[in-house]
Amino acid sequence: MRLALLLLAILVATELVVSGKNPILQCMGNRGFCRSSCKKSEQAYFYCRTFQMCCLQSYVRISLTGVDDNTNWSYEKHWPRIP
């Protein structure tokens, strides 16, 4: 009986250790995932802190120039003017 309890305790303890996953690191403001290789539907843009690629979905657009697109949303329209 003791042997069965000991085996059960070892089995449960090893299952908890083996089943634990590493948390997936996110990058680009939670738009991408840090992986060693990107999936077919993803593109690598730069590297994460873990020296893995930051993989983004193909539909995610990033402005590399830092210039905002020409939209109606602007800083002047967002904040009220102070007289």
Swiss-Prot record:
Its main location: secreted. Specifically expressed in male gonads (Sertoli cells). Keywords: Antibiotic, Antimicrobial, Defensin, Disulfide bond, Secreted, Signal. It comes from the Eukaryota. Disulfide bonds join C27-C54, C34-C48, C38-C55. Residues 1-19 form the signal peptide. GO terms for biological process: defense response to Gram-negative bacterium; defense response to Gram-positive bacterium. It is found in: Secreted. The keyword Secreted applies. The keyword Secreted applies. GO terms for cellular component: extracellular region. It holds the Pfam family Defensin_big. InterPro entries: Defensin_big_dom. Belongs to the beta-defensin family. Has antibacterial activity. This is Beta-defensin 19.
